[in-house]
Amino acid sequence: MKKLKPILLLCMFLAFIGTSCKKSSTNPTSAVSMSLKFNGTAKTSNTVAADYIKSTGTLQVIGKFGNEGLSLMITDIKVGTFAVGDIVIATYSTTADFQNTYLGSTGTVVISSFNSSTVTGTFSFAGTTVDGRNGTVTEGKFSAKVITQ
């Protein structure tokens, strides 16, 4: 019985090691990121979300830069170039309470790739706040995981 105990412990240890090891994924995950310049100041973020509402074909991409944030809402989403103001609503807020939000009036959003799991693209637009201040978003790009509703 004394010889059986070490063998049993060794078997339990090997079983534990064999089941606790996890294989690394062979599929690399896409990076989630957004970068842009607002009025010439560079901003980058890894806090990005993309919500796809399948029934309406609408995609909303949101990026957070501390207390600031950007939102792109695109209707009838597909790979292609879209004009801000037509089927794209683009906003940039410089405060967490959205009191200083620039609503895009001109610009473009280019969707480079879009599928059930990821979306990537570029964007630029000019916008105005409700009190008439102007702002520009340039050199925008994003990569996000898609959540389908």
Language model features with spans:
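Hydrophobic transmembrane alpha-helix bundles
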Residues: 1-3, 66, 121
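Bacterial Sec-dependent N-terminal signal peptides
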Residues: 3-6, 16-40
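Long amphipathic alpha-helical coiled-coil/heptad-repeat bundle
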Residues: 11-14
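Repeat-unit-sized solenoid/scaffold elements
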Residues: 20-29, 67-74, 143-149
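Surface-exposed helix/loop patches within compact recognition domains
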Residues: 32-37, 41-118, 126-130
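C-terminal or internal capping secondary-structure element at the end of a domain, subdomain, or sheet
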Residues: 112-149
